[in-house]
Amino acid sequence: MEEYTREPCPYRIGDDIGSAFAMGLVGGSIFQAFGGYKNAAKGKKLVGMMREVRMRSTLTGVQFAAWGGMFSTIDCCLVAIRKKEDPINSIVSGGLTGALLAIRSGPKVMAGSAILGSVILAMIEGVGLVTTRWMGAMMDPTQPPPEALDDPRSLGQKSQAEPGLDQTRPFGIPTGLPNLS
């Protein structure tokens, strides 16, 4: 399938770790900025916001990178075992990643994290497949062209507006509106 052409697995893992770290750093900075602003004393809002961003957003980035690295590693292992690359690999990888990251919390939390990871990845894969198929159909050169647009010359004359309305409006503002000036 064309939608699954990516880097080879050893490079994919590093690429996904870096991308996940960047997403976690940016998202964590935004999230921590709101929390720092909300919890800071009056008159110290900016200082509190920057302190929270500096101290906590890198931790969020590292946690995202750990998730991304584990997900990519499991995904690459599944590709090697199954000998094909399809959405099932990503869904199973999301579930196993959620389970492995929650393993110290007990079997109930581990099962919940596995289900949540699988459901989230299934939704992401579903949206990706629908989007790819929809865009692929739009770009298919074998499809007939869309219906021809009407030639402006064949549309006829413009209808006249009611008397007493301003006809000279600049910048593409439609004519036929009452003059408000």
Swiss-Prot record:
- Which BP terms in the Gene Ontology apply to this protein? protein import into mitochondrial matrix
Q: Where does the sequence pass through the membrane?
A: 17-37, 61-81, 109-129
* Compartment annotation: Mitochondrion inner membrane
In alphabetical order, the GO MF annotations are: protein transmembrane transporter activity
UniProt entry keywords in alphabetical sequence: Membrane, Mitochondrion, Mitochondrion inner membrane, Protein transport, Translocation, Transmembrane, Transmembrane helix, Transport
Q: Which domain of life is it from?
A: Eukaryota
Q: Which segments carry the region annotation Disordered?
A: 137-181
Q: How does it sit in the membrane?
A: Multi-pass membrane protein
InterPro entries, per this entry? Tim17 (IPR005678)
- One Gene Ontology cellular component: TIM23 mitochondrial import inner membrane translocase complex
> Where does the UniProt entry say this protein principally localizes?
mitochondrion
What does it do?
Essential component of the TIM23 complex, a complex that mediates the translocation of transit peptide-containing proteins across the mitochondrial inner membrane.
Q: Which family does it belong to?
A: Belongs to the Tim17/Tim22/Tim23 family.
> This chain belongs to which protein, by name?
Probable mitochondrial import inner membrane translocase subunit tim-17B.1
Q: Which source organism does the UniProt entry give?
A: Caenorhabditis elegans
Q: Which gene encodes it?
A: timm-17B.1
